[in-house]
A protein has these predicted regions:
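Alpha-helix capping/termination and helix-coil
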Residues: 328, 380, 479-491, 508-521, ...
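Generic alpha-helical transmembrane segments
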Residues: 432, 437, 477-478, 501-516
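Helix-coil boundary and interhelical linker segments in multi-pass alpha-helical membrane proteins
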Residues: 412-421, 485-500
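Membrane-water interface at loop-to-transmembrane-helix junctions
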Residues: 454-476, 496-503
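Core segments of transmembrane alpha-helices
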Residues: 400-404, 469-481, 542
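Conserved cytosolic headpiece of P-type ATPases
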Residues: 1-454, 459-462, 505, 522-601
Length: 601
């Protein structure tokens, strides 16, 4: 008996519970466009303190559109009128059509490349693309793709004797001295006019790209000194409406959100303001250059105020993850490129984008299939749901275990040798553990979990409130146990001592089942959401039905049923006795309501 008591003190169902919770919630998350690659990722997501998020396609729609073309002197040429400036358009078309990773397919759709490439390809159109592709004079002889370090791409076309460029305006403006006018003639570049125009567009959340050409051969990792600016395009990418709300919910959950983008600072700040990331003057936006000029200690002192990192490099992501982890923060990081893989792998939770590279997906613990910040918020919510469901099971099972151990250990001192038989304790330990996991493992996600502060890394799973609930309800179950067993009042409902001990076995199980309602909510909504967790009531009534069969097995005149009754030391008792034990078991609910009123003030 002592060994059985020790076994009952341990919640063996906890590993099963954790497995069920993870399995059930990860399958639900697929409906929210979240694929969990590593189970620990979703659990950790519920503990995030800081989240570094990409901009394009995650916070913004990722549906880029060229909305304006302007000359190096700052004058805008309406897109429909660009054909009137044939020299400018011809050079611009080559700089785009031969210098992007996108193309038109057989179905006349733009494929390949990133969102920026696709927006530019749509801008020049399929007819222009076909001309550039089919005519030999436009054959590329040398090329270098865009990367986050250079911030430009280039192609050399020897037939034309030129190298064409596409990239960040500042890369050109630091070198160029010449530019085209509207007639395609080379003129002196006016820096004041163009900088004012770029800054104005950037402040309106527009991304600006520059285009140029050189009459020299291509130089690896460099723009030639004789580069001539052709012009600039402004690209718009609006903030997702649902992302704005999701960012607010994540920030209200106590999670700091930092937007990391390759855009220039003014554009990034404008997007961050639209998305609700920057709300007051204390919120900081830094460029990669400014970030790298700061020491780790300086960054740590201001980390709580950082909202934007512009012109960011992949190395900036890895550094920020390391610094935050040194501060004992739980870090989330998004990424989609090969260069993002180290940061995704190093972060506590790496969110790889569904449209990203296989290397990024392999490095991340979670794949966001639709690249949407809203889905990241859902992942955080389900992470917190998993944690809460595990806590619910622990409270449910520990009350049973505490009461079973205490009653079995001290009952002999009160003249009751074996209130719970060995088979009763095994039923409590095995059946209630396993089915309890099913009851509580599928509890629905509640938006109120997003109102809680993130958990600390070193935070104990058993809080003071949780311990108070376990001890209070365990103590009450012990009280009604001894009241039922020792008070003469209850003898009148049973004919024999065997019937009373059988009824006590039923009372113990019913009390545990009613306590299952108590642990569903820390406040008073203990019956809400049952339609979303149909398994709870199914298990509730299945256990009652199984107990009724065990208790009344002796009524069936077959050896197997008599054996079941004898094995569990159970004999049938009357309907009045059933009403009594149901009422006593139900008292677990009002007693816990009183406890909540006292402790939750």
């Amino acid at each position: 008996m002592a060994i059985v008591i020790i076994v009952c003190a341990v919640p063996e169902g906890l590993p099963l519970m954790i497995s069920l919770v993870l399995m059930q919630n990860t399958s639900k998350m697929l409906d929210h466009n979240v694929l969990v690659r590593k189970a620990e990722g979703i659990e950790t997501a519920g503990s995030l303190n800081i989240l570094f998020s990409d901009k394009t396609g995650t916070i913004t729609k990722g549906m880029l559109e060229v909305v304006e073309f302007f000359m190096p002197n700052g004058d805008t040429i309406p897109i429909d009128n660009l054909g009137l400036h044939s020299k400018v358009k011809a050079l611009l078309d080559i700089s785009i059509g031969k210098n992007t990773a996108s193309m038109f397919d057989a179905n006349h759709k733009v494929i390949g490349g990133n969102a920026t490439d696709q927006a530019l390809m749509k801008f020049i159109g399929e007819e222009t693309y076909n001309v550039l592709t089919n005519e030999s004079e436009y054959s590329v002889t040398n090329s270098q793709g865009f990367n986050s370090s250079n911030k430009f791409s280039q192609v050399e076309i020897k037939e034309l004797g030129k190298t064409f460029y596409k990239g960040a305006p500042e890369k050109f403006l630091s070198i160029a001295t010449k530019a085209l006018d509207e007639d395609g003639n080379e003129v002196e570049l006016n820096f004041d006019e163009i900088n004012e125009k770029i800054n104005t567009l950037a402040s309106r959340a527009m991304r600006v790209l520059a285009f140029g050409y050189s009459n020299s051969s291509m130089t690896e990792n460099a723009i030639n000194d004789d580069v001539v600016l052709i012009g600039f395009v402004a690209i718009r990418d609006d903030v997702r409406p649902e992302a704005k709300m999701a960012i607010k919910e994540v920030m209200d959950a106590g999670i700091q959100v930092v937007m990391i983008t390759g855009d220039r600072l003014e554009t990034a700040v404008s997007i961050a303001e639209d998305a609700g990331l920057i709300q007051n003057q204390s919120d900081k936006a830094l460029t990669s250059t400014e970030l790298n000029s700061l020491s780790d200690d300086e960054i740590k002192s201001m980390i709580k105020d950082i909202r934007v990192i512009a012109r960011a490099l992949p190395t900036d992501k890895s550094r920020m993850v390391r610094i935050c982890q040194e501060m004992n923060l739980v870090v989330g990081m998004t990424g989609d490129g090969v260069n993002d893989s180290p940061a995704l792998k190093r972060a506590d939770v790496g969110f790889a984008m569904g449209s990203g590279t296989e290397a990024a997906k392999e490095a991340g613990k979670i794949v966001v299939l639709d690249d949407n910040f809203r889905s990241i918020k859902d992942a955080i919510l389900y992470g917190r749901t998993i944690y809460h469901n595990i806590l619910k099971f622990c409270k449910f099972q520990l009350v049973i275990n505490v009461a079973a151990v205490v009653v079995s250990a001290i009952a002999p001192f009160f003249g009751v040798d074996e209130p719970l038989k060995v088979t009763h304790l095994l039923f409590v330990n095995l059946v209630m553990d396993g089915l309890g996991a099913i009851m509580l493992g599928n509890e629905p996600a509640k938006e109120k979990y997003m109102e809680e502060a993130p958990r600390r890394r070193d935070e104990s799973i058993v809080s003071k409130k949780m311990m108070a609930q376990i001890l209070t309800m365990g103590a009450w179950l012990v009280v009604i146990s001894f009241a039922f067993l020792k008070l003469p009042f209850f003898d009148q409902f049973f004919n024999t001592e065997e019937q009373k001990l059988t009824a006590y076995f039923v009372l113990f199980i019913l009390s545990a089942l009613f306590n299952g309602f108590n642990v569903r909510d820390e406040r008073f909504a203990i019956f809400s959401g049952l339609n979303e967790n149909t398994g709870f009531l199914k298990v509730f009534f299945v256990i009652i039905a199984v107990q009724a069969c065990i208790v009344n097995a002796g009524l069936v005149n077959l050896d197997i049923f008599k054996w079941i009754g004898e094995m569990f030391s159970c004999v049938p008792f009357g309907i009045t006795g059933w009403v009594v034990v149901i009422i006593l078991g139900f008292t677990m609910i009002p007693v816990d309501i009183v406890r909540k009123l006292i402790f939750n003030k």
